[in-house]
Amino acid sequence: MTDEKEYGSLGRLAPEWDGDGRERNLTADDIYERFFGWVEDVKGIEPWPHQEEAIMDLLAGDHVILNTPTGSGKSLVALGMHFAALCTGRRSYYTAPIKALVSEKFFDLVEVFGRDNVGMITGDSHINADAPIICCTAEILANQALREGTHADVGLVAMDEFHYYGDPERGWAWQVPLLTLPQTQFLLMSATLGNVDAIADKLSDLNDTPDVDVIADAPRPVPLSYEYTLDPMEKTVELAFRNGETPIYVVHFSQDAALETAQALASTGVSSKEQRQAIAEAIKGVKFTTAFGKILQRLLRTGVGIHHAGMLPRYRRLVEQLAQQGLLPVICGTDTLGVGINVPIHSVVLTALTKFDGTKMRRLRAREFHQIAGRAGRMGFDTEGLVIAEAPEYEIENQKAIAKAGGDPKKLKKVKRKKAPEGFVTWNQSTFDKLIDAEPETLVPHLKITHSMVLNEVAQGGDARARIDDLIDDSAQTPDQKEHLHQRADEIFQTLFDTEVIETEDCKDGGKDYYMTLDMPDDFALDQPLSPFLLAALELLDPESDTYALDVISMAEATLEDPKQVLRAQERQARDKAMADMKADGLDYDERMDKLQEITYPKPLEDMLEAAFDQYRHDVPWANDYWLSPKSVVRDMVETASDFTGYITRYNIARSEGTLLRYLSDAYRTLARTVPPEKRDEQLEDIISWLRVLVRSIDSSLVDEWENAGDSADQSEAAASLAAPGKKNAVVEDRRGLIVLIRNAMFRRVQLMDLDQPDKLGALDKDWGSGVHEWEDVLDDYYDEHEYVGIGAEARSPELFMLDDKHENDEHTWKVRQIIDDSDGDHDWAIEGIVDLDATQDTGEVVFHDYKVSN
């Protein structure tokens, strides 16, 4: 956070966006002097020559390709571009490949330019979307470029991580704006672009401004040294620690491997007593409430951090903050480090020079290597950074055996050298040296033509077919690829004509004017492109059905991106249960294996949804670009009365709790925003409120960051678009959602009573005096009196749940009572407790006092 004087300080140096009260359209010299005066006076930075050169080029109206090393100040150049745009009355955009980077940049720019001058669009977040500076994902800008073309109000664009231009799946979004926004000035930035001559030539040919300046000669601020080692990982890190070469980032290519290394290093003494004391003080007020959080807390206290995409955002940011304060000697993480994450590092240790790319194991490419290695070396702290590569495990074992022989020729002869495992993709010192010397590969352009791209062009008006043909012809693709793209465009246009989604009118000049026969959603082709299908599919459900609310959830879940780790865990558990059942039924091995392949995770309403989607794709052809994915995560949590922690435990997915949270947050937004109020019954309203409480209680970091980014009357509304809504001035933030959370927790215990599982009940309730032994006694007594525990609709009815809130305001507690629906209808047994409202809302789990189960 900046101080009060710095907040919005650069924004105050520019004319107001509406033009009132200050001068407009400053000269290039004025802008240059104001900006670099601010850089030196407010930020205390002396700019480098290449930064001054880049900003002078931008002020002259040229495009700039900034191909400079990590840490060379590309962000400052982008800042200068935004300032220049603000001073000349033009709207500017910052694009990045991932939402986390967009969000990070948004908050950074708010601090510098002020809240009113900066907006963010990521598909599921729209904040101040009419602002003069917009932060968005690359796909957002690409779709806007297709839909508005030369009419788009896009004056300048800073495209960060521009090496994504070469990404096979997403590269189209980096190429399309260059092809369709001739009026726009571009700043293309990356540390690993390689040869950019073809990109510069293409931009010069197509844009109204032909001048493209390539800045690629900036020296690396902190030089790098390289080592290849046959030492085990623990020894490598320990030596680096002793030599003062911290902070160390140990790079892995899987989340599980990162955690395993962290746990191994935690016991090797990679931090000093003073560091551990400083860390303990820094995390004193942090609540590590989840299963992985408790693991992280233990690791942090030893000086070891974890950083990967499967973590909760608040834990990831905590690790980054501790690293920025210089408190963490070691961080174990994945190669996501290479994508713009702001963590200061002295040494990078690569655990391998190979990775699994989704289809096969392969060696790192030069771009991937430099993207990671380039993070080493802290500007202003280090005279050089260190990059260490570990040898393969079998080579390390061989070296151990040789060292053990101690130079004795006889012993050396007896050493049995291990070989690489069969099929193992290996590497050696030569591999490492080649990567060090290699320039990043020349970016290979990618383009695709989809229904949504065509319809975005049609929405622009005029001759959409001619513009699509021009898009293909102007692209950087090969002749064969262009021919294939033209064929694909033919197919899509024909489909749209056949289904009467588009029609044409002849123009006087002999051309054609394309138009749509139906309205396309305003937020079409963003992050939830199947929302229109969800609205249509809701008509298939019977609102009077007992499962209506759950079925709406299943329809919504089918439109969401798969949380793969969660679904794999569901499938694994389903197969384990099926295997046990088949063994009990006496099926032979081959038959069990055959049947096992047919078992997967739950997919409610799969047949209905697939039939409906087939018809929808016929009626609405742009849906052919997407697919449904039926699944049951939210529904599963509701049916089993699970809270976040309980669900994590049930499927053993503590390492992927961040993935689950993101999914629940997406589900909350979809249900809250897409399902109309008239399609919600009481149960669905309860579930939406419960999700809202759950998401915010687990991780409110996005909301908190927004609330800290200056004062504004609309902050709560904006916060709601980032995550579940923020706090209100009341003991209970969301009464309805909290009641559902508590009722679910109580009913989960009823379900476990029905299953006669005192071990699980004891695990839930041991902290308030009802451990396994107490629950064993309770269940024995209960089943002496009654035959079974009811878990049907009557058992879950409001009549069997009681809430007394008379001490809500003075003691911040509720008294709750869940009556058991016993086999005899006596209703003489109940679970009772005093709920700690503050702790419950902080953790997303019900925290009790005075808890008991009795008759």
Can you describe what each PLM-predicted range is?
Residues 227-253, 260-263, 317-326:
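Conserved interdomain hinge at the start of the Helicase C-terminal
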Residues 154-157, 330-355, 384-390:
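A short beta-strand element within the Helicase C-terminal
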Residues 93-95, 103, 110-119, 255-330, ...:
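Conserved C-terminal RecA-like helicase domain
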Residues 38, 42-229, 247-272, 307:
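Conserved P-loop/Walker A NTP-binding site and adjacent catalytic elements of P-loop NTPases
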